[in-house]
Structures are given as C-alpha cells and as structure tokens.
Amino acid sequence: MDQSNRYARLDLQEADLIAGGRHVLCAYVMKPKAGYGYLETAAHFAAESSTGTNVEVSTTDDFTRGVDALVYEIDPEKEIMKIAYPVELFDRNIIDGRAMLCSFLTLTIGNNQGMGDVEYAKMHDFYVPPCYLRLFDGPSMNIADMWRVLGRDVRNGGMVVGTIIKPKLGLRPKPFADACHEFWLGGDFIKNDEPQGNQTFAPLKETIRLVADAMKRAQDETGEAKLFSANITADDHYEMVARGEYILETFGENADHVAFLVDGYVTGPAAITTARRQFPRQFLHYHRAGHGAVTSPQSMRGYTAFVLSKMARLQGASGIHTGTMGYGKMEGEAADKIMAYMLTDEAAEGPFYRQDWLGLKATTPIISGGMNALRLPGFFDNLGHSNVIQTSGGGAFGHLDGGTAGAKSLRQSHEAWMAGVDLVTYAREHRELARAFESFPADADKFYPGWRDRLHRAA
C-alpha cells in the first residue's frame, strides 16, 4: 500500500523543521528492494517507525495523524532519506519525565530494520531539538575531572597516557596487579579490558584489592596520581551496583581516581543509564565492543559509529572509544575526526546536521587499537589536538624494555608533538622513545624512513 500521501511531505523545509523545534530529524542511507518505488518505501519506513503499519486501521484519529513521522527529503540516486519524528512520539520516564535512549532506538532503528520492501537502511546522522535534548542526562564527568586528579590544567591538560592490561584474559590477580604497578610507574591510566571481570581464575574482589594496593604503591613511588577504569558490566542492575560499590569501598581515599567501564553496546542503554545515575561522581567509560556488527562500513543496516558516539554523549558517557581514525589497527579513516568533534565541541557539524549541545558537558574521545609511540604524532596532526585518553596495550607492553618504558615512550611521543619536534630528533635524547623505534620496527620503517641512521647520528 502506497502511504506517501500521509507519511511524506516533501514540501517541508529542513530549516523550518529545526526552527520549529518539535522534531527529531534522522538521515538514512536507504535502498528499496527491487520492484518498490523510493518514495513509497520511504513513506512505509516512516509509518512503521511511528503511527502506521502496512494497512489503514480504524482506530486512527486526527490526533494520531498529527504525530506521524514524515519523510521530508529524498535523493533516490544517492539513496538519501530524511525523516522528521515529532518529539511527542518518544517515551519518557514515569518517575522523572526524562528521555530514554531505548525509545529513540525503538522508533528510529526498530522494526524498520526488518521491513520486507527495504534492501537496507542505515542511520548516518540525527538532530535533537532543544526541548528533547534537555531531557537527556548528558555527562556528569569528563577528562577535565581526570586532569584535576592528575594535577593538570583542567582546560587543556593534554593526553592521558593509558593502557589495557594484556593478555585480555588469563592473568590471575597478582600478575594482573603487578602489570598495573609496572605501567603506573610511567603512565597515568589503566583500564580493564572489556572481558575482564569476575572469572573463576581471577575473582573480582581479590583482583581489585591488589590493584588498589598497586595504585597506592605507584603513587607513593612516583609522587603522581594514578587512574583505574574498572569494569562493572553485568546483565543485572543490582550486580553492576554491587560491583561499583565494592570497588569504591576498596579504593577508599582513592575512589575519585576510579572510572567505571561499561560495555554499552552489548548491554544496551539501560546499563549506561544505570552507571550514570547510580555513580554520578565517577567517570563513565563507555566501551563499545561489538559495535562493528552494525556500525562497520561493511554493514548496510543499523547506524554508524558517528551515531553511536552522539548517542553516548546524550546518555551521559564521560568518554567513549572512537577508534584510531586510520592510524591504528582498527577499521577507520582520517575523516572520522568529526566523531571526536561532535563529542567535545559545544556545537559541531555532522554528516548531515549541525548539533548545538546547549551547554551539555563534553564526552572525551578514548583512543585505542594498535597505537604506539610512533603512531601518535600523525594521529594528533589529523585531530588537531591531544586532549584525549589514549590506551595502548601492545604499544606499552610490547616495548622491548617492558610496560614502564612503554608508558614513558608514549608520554615522550606526546611531549615531542606538543613541542613541535620531529620524533626521531626527540628520541635521540629520550631512551624509552628511542627503544620504541626498535620495538616496533615495521611502523618505524613505514612512518620514519631512514630512522636508523637518523636516530644514531650525532646530535
């Protein structure tokens, strides 16, 4: 059934919809299946996403028609479809009237993902009007709070030098804590890898107790504050809270040095909101393991990594992994930097929409996946700044001289970039950085041709 006479209004102007402030706008790349018209399929998509179905129903009244989602722009050649969703469609909490991301997803990326007349449809951007934006929690903490703990400038404190303890599974509590101590002697921040939790060979309570002690010892030995991101991911709300409370109690006076990591993609919006509301004084570390199933450019359905990041800021993530923008081992490209800008800027341009965040606190980009000291300068050149959390697993513990030296090499790489000094030149007077060239020779050859002669040349 062609529903374009009801669910399509191509005379609507995007600027007018934004000025009206009553619609969430979504931009998709959509292709109908063979034999279906573009506008007809787009209208069915909007109907299925809001007030309609595949037939007219007798219970529809004038009010119902007033909250229809409307297709307002199409470009069949480029497969672009834009839909305006009235804000009244989205579910709100009965306890406080706040917005819920699960409702946003249910409507905009819900049943429409399985429609028989749609070959594929993927959301590439969305716009949130002020009246709806104000109903989301947004972050309570971000990198500025980490800088404060570290004793840095809270406006431009620079890269937080971090790692992921490797191997990701198989370490028992003491070796795990020993690895933490080793890295902290040179670095700032350690995160649990996403599967690390309460395995039988590494009970959480024993591991956390030893890690808290390792942090105290490292702080005493270096005179510097240290940070730890502890995984509290769980299916059950009460389990998450129990883990969080135990961790804070165990770290004691260093509780403000602790972030909580939640696997936000696999556990969903409920887990992120649980952590955000139950622990508002902790940095909420959004890990996105599994997201590539829908966000990868190879996937033609779902939504992009840009959309995931934007949703994370709405929900209140203090930081979210944003990949390495083509400079590490994970899928990505240099243009992905717009993802970081959308997280950090007061107003930013997306692929289709400009979003004004109305003072909502920024979310911190977390950079990980195949990074080491040799890859950092190019990454920072592309991004234009270094106010990120950077976590290198192999880039730290793959250093020939161990985790402490690996951490120092990462810090020295950042120092060189901040000073505008060529990395090979800087390495001549910084042993750990020099050894990073020897630790990762394939990267050294790729990014710094002739480094061997230059590194050992007399200054």
UniProtKB/Swiss-Prot annotation:
Highest taxon listed in the record's lineage: Bacteria
Reactions it catalyzes: 2 (2R)-3-phosphoglycerate + 2 H(+) = D-ribulose 1,5-bisphosphate + CO2 + H2O; D-ribulose 1,5-bisphosphate + O2 = 2-phosphoglycolate + (2R)-3-phosphoglycerate + 2 H(+)
Site (Transition state stabilizer): K329
Protein family: Belongs to the RuBisCO large chain family. Type II subfamily.
Note: The basic functional RuBisCO is composed of a large chain homodimer in a 'head-to-tail' conformation. In contrast to form I RuBisCO, the form II RuBisCO are composed solely of large subunits.
One example of a Gene Ontology biological process annotation: reductive pentose-phosphate cycle
Residues at which substrate binds: N111, K168, R288, H321, S368
Organism of this sequence: Cereibacter sphaeroides (strain ATCC 17023 / DSM 158 / JCM 6121 / CCUG 31486 / LMG 2827 / NBRC 12203 / NCIMB 8253 / ATH 2.4.1.) (Rhodobacter sphaeroides)
EC number: 4.1.1.39
Protein name: Ribulose bisphosphate carboxylase
Subunit structure: Homodimer.
Residues annotated for Mg(2+) binding in this entry: K191, D193, E194
